[in-house]
Amino acid sequence: MFVGNHEHTIDDKGRLILPSSFRARLADGAYVTTLDQCIAIVPPDEFARMADRLDEEVSEGLVDVNAVRVFFSQADFVTPDTQGRVRLLPHLREHVGLERSVIVTGYNRRIEVWDPERFAERTAVGTESLADAITRGRGVGRT
């Protein structure tokens, strides 16, 4: 499981140093793609689960096959180097508006890389939604 937020930078070669707490799970590589206005870094086992779900949703007519085609065609497989850096392809960075400063955050089974301003906007909305869910007895606060 990936949790926590980290402020990092993308170097001039388009590489991101992964937080040390995330590296062990990605030692054998990960898939990198865009997802929900961020870059997602996904371990192979989770990416396979995502692929299976997408195949099912396409066959059930819930998701357009062309959207799935774009999702996979834009993906990249990366292996962290000895310093824990991974390459983020230019087209992925441009698609989600990443420049030098980024927020690297854990999202359960994947890592997300966000533009700091966009992440702050999403976090504000998420904080309100979480508080509302807890107040109504749903989500995290439920026992």
Each predicted region: which residue ranges?
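Flexible "stalk/tail and boundary" regions
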Residues: 1-8, 12, 22-78, 82-83, ...
